Amino acid sequence: MKICRLEDLYTKITILVKNRIIMISRRSFLSKAAAATVATALTPYVFSRGCIKKNNSPLEGKKVLFVWGGWMGHEPDKCRDIFVPWMESEGAKVTVSETLDAYLKMDKKQLDLIIQIWTMGQITGDQENALLDAISDGVGIAGWHGGLGDSFRNNVAYQFMVGGQWVAHPGGVIDYRVNIVDHDDPITMGLSDFDMHSEQYFMHVDPNVKVLATTTFSDEHADWIGGNVIPVVWKKAYGKGRVFYSSLGHVSADFNVPEALEIQKRGIRWASLSKYEPMEDWKQPVYADWGKRG
């Protein structure tokens, strides 16, 4: 990936420096005072012909199927235009499809990653079986918000794969905070808690997903859920396949929040490595001790 514009470089390092003492402005971020911070932020990059080039992207050479459609209120076309060019800039070979029949036509042996943004709608039995079979055999999948977590409400096998299902967003578009709860995982490492102005997804979630970020609900819009903590970002396994999900991204403008965009990019990279890295081993039996509580 090349970053040849000053503005792009500024965006890339914003997350890494925003919570430090040295705050880099657009006019001063090349100053001597900021040099040490910039050097640290750019450690993964090398200079080439006046540009910044990221080394060894996990997406280099990966074959990606990007399937979009469903309810257009989630702006799948605008989100497509954010992520497809980015993946291609990282060296991925991306096939874009506006039909779920793409799952019937894909060659799972030649595919590394599926990205789906398809809110609501219906999927046929053959389409669903082809999708789940590919992931179970090692094709990764990544997505966000309703495009993955509220796709096919009647298909419980699909929801079993995702690891969760949207059920409510009390208050609609509101201000809320996202809390990073795993600071060691590469997807969230180096990130701090951040604020969103969007839909706060209340979800029913598989207890064995690896939770990376959460949000806490108030009692303003539904008093019985006040204080409830719900996962926002998780990763999981489905057979041999990696599954990454973030509930952020109600509309494309949500990805103007640097942390929301960075989390999604990192999750996509992680999911693309299903066939190339061993599956992580974790178990989080969150209900195991319930019967033992006094």
Predicted regions and their residues:
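N-terminal export signals
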Residues: 2, 28-49
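C-terminal segment of N-terminal export signals and the immediately downstream linker at the start
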Residues: 3-5, 15-23, 45-68
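Helical hinge/lid and interdomain linker segments adjacent to catalytic or ligand-binding clefts
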Residues: 24, 66, 75-149
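Catalytic beta-strand/loop cores that center a nucleophilic Ser/Cys/Thr
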Residues: 59-60, 88, 93, 167-239, ...
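Extracellular ligand-binding/catalytic regions of CAZymes and related secreted enzymes
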Residues: 59-62, 89, 221-230, 237-294
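Residue-level signal for short, function-critical loop segments
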Residues: 68-71, 249
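Short, solvent-exposed loop/turn elements at domain surfaces
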Residues: 71-77, 96, 220-223, 253-257
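A glycine-rich, often tryptophan-bearing local segment used as a flexible ligand/cofactor-contacting loop or short
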Residues: 121-190
